[in-house]
Structure formats: structure tokens, C-alpha cells
């Protein structure tokens, strides 16, 4: 090479060694094209880099904006599926847009709720008709408090039930008997 008009160390002669693929741009790319702009310094030209501003990522097969290298910054947990999840597994399908991957979302079609840590079917998130009043305890009460321990399965939580082991007698029944 006898001439390098942009001064990046790659020559302008197309038939010479280490030909500059971007003749008029000072560039440092060395992987896919020589001498082209490489903003993030990962060795790949910006044109050949799906994420040109993140050096730990360069491929994005499904074009969702999350890099295919799971170990890199914002690594895609579902690299072959377009996805928008941002909470936990990144770049996976999230139908309701709450940020949680549908497979990990207890309610994949309700943006307000997504988890049930105690597995009782009531949501950990508050302010909905499915919100668990006792999110750390698996319970099935549904009358006075939602999702709390109900030993006799009468719908009244043990905490409010004068007879927590007798489904035929509850605090509510006692109140009605007194009136």
C-alpha cells in the first residue's frame, strides 16, 4: 500500500494487502471490514454491528434490540424470538407489555399483575381484584381477605375466623346470629 488518504493505517489500493473498506473515513474496524468506523471499539464496523454503541454485543438475530450474547450487556435470553421483556429474562415475548417474559408471567395478558410468589393463585402486586393480602403465605381465603390462610376452607381467613377449623361456623355467621 502506498497511499492512505484517511490516515487510519489501511491503504487505498484495492488490490493491495489490508485494503481500506472505507476510504474517506478514519476507522479502526478489523473484523468484518477494515478501516471503517467502529464506535464501540469491538473490532466490527458500525455497518456490520447490530449494536454499534455496545462493545459486548454485535449480533441481534431477531432484531429486538437485545444482543445475542447472553453474557454481554443487555444479553437476549430469547435470541431467536423477537421480544420486549425487560424484567428478568431480557428480549423475550411479553404480550401485555409489563416487562415480564410471558413464560415467567403468572398473568401474561394483564399488565397490572405478573407474579404469585406463594403459588396460591393471587397476585403479589397490590390494588387489583386478584391482589394477595398475604403474599408470603399460600392461602385461599376469599371473603374478608384475599389469599390468606383459611384452614377450614370456608372463605374467611383464619385471622378473622373465630372457628378457623370449623367450616360450618365463621365469624360472619356469628355476626348474623347476633342480629
Predicted segments, located by residue:
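Extracellular calcium-associated, cysteine-rich motifs in secreted modular proteins
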Residues: 1-179
Amino acid at each position: 500500500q502506498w497511499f492512505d488518504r484517511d490516515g487510519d493505517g489501511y491503504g487505498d489500493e484495492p488490490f493491495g494487502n489490508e485494503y481500506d473498506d472505507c476510504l474517506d473515513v478514519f476507522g479502526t474496524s478489523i473484523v468484518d471490514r477494515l478501516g471503517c468506523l467502529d464506535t464501540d471499539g469491538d473490532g466490527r464496523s458500525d455497518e456490520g454491528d447490530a449494536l454499534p454503541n455496545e462493545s459486548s454485543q454485535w449480533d441481534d438475530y431477531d432484531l429486538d434490540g437485545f444482543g445475542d450474547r447472553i453474557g454481554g450487556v443487555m444479553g437476549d435470553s430469547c435470541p431467536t424470538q423477537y421480544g420486549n421483556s425487560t424484567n428478568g429474562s431480557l428480549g423475550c415475548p411479553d404480550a401485555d407489555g409489563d416487562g415480564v417474559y410471558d413464560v415467567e408471567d403468572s398473568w401474561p395478558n394483564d399488565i397490572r399483575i405478573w407474579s404469585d410468589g406463594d403459588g396460591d393463585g393471587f397476585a403479589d402486586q397490590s390494588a387489583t381484584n386478584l391482589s394477595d393480602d398475604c403474599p408470603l403465605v399460600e392461602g385461599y381465603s376469599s371473603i374478608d381477605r384475599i389469599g390468606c390462610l383459611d384452614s377450614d376452607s370456608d372463605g374467611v381467613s383464619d385471622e378473622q375466623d373465630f372457628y378457623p377449623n370449623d367450616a360450618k361456623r365463621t365469624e360472619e355467621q356469628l355476626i348474623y346470629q347476633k342480629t
